[in-house]
Amino acid sequence: MFLRQEDFATVVRSTPLVSLDFIVENSRGEFLLGKRTNRPAQGYWFVPGGRVQKDETLEAAFERLTMAELGLRLPITAGQFYGVWQHFYDDNFSGTDFTTHYVVLGFRFRVSEEELLLPDEQHDDYRWLTSDALLASDNVHANSRAYFLAEKRTGVPGL
């Protein structure tokens, strides 16, 4: 269920959003990051993912989002649950007048790069980086780097 922009703004202003993030690994042990074109985290490299819609099961959201973000429809059983995370942003999808709060369910899985059909709606570029390279880059958003930092994983529910 997609909301009108005004209604969605009320939701984002008032409540946390639920989303899925995908920690996608290739056969070389590199991880997929896309350069975000939209707020929040605009201009940063970020793992693929997206919001769960109202009345959408996690299984359906996983399949919809893997198709939308990777061009490859995968069942939720393809992913290893990677914990419950919290993401806080100073801006929102429409500007800087209120913050955004996400409760994020992480899923990690391996894919064959050749199977992916990466879209350009949410990201204007993609890269595969080793965990060391993405941790060393200030252009990778802190919320994505956290998935690879042992001290950030400590105490994360589900890990």
UniProtKB/Swiss-Prot annotation:
Binds 1 Mg(2+) ion per subunit. Keywords: Hydrolase, Lipopolysaccharide biosynthesis, Magnesium, Metal-binding. Substrate binds at residues 2-3, 8, 36. Residues 13-153 form the Nudix hydrolase domain. It comes from the Bacteria. A motif (Nudix box) lies at residues 50-71. Its cofactor is Mg(2+). Changing residue 87 to Q: Increases Km for GDP-mannose 4-fold. Reduces activity 200-fold. The keyword Hydrolase applies. Belongs to the Nudix hydrolase family. PANTHER family: GDP-MANNOSE MANNOSYL HYDROLASE. This is GDP-mannose mannosyl hydrolase. It comes from Escherichia coli (strain K12). The lineage of its organism: Bacteria, Pseudomonadati, Pseudomonadota, Gammaproteobacteria, Enterobacterales. The gene is gmm.
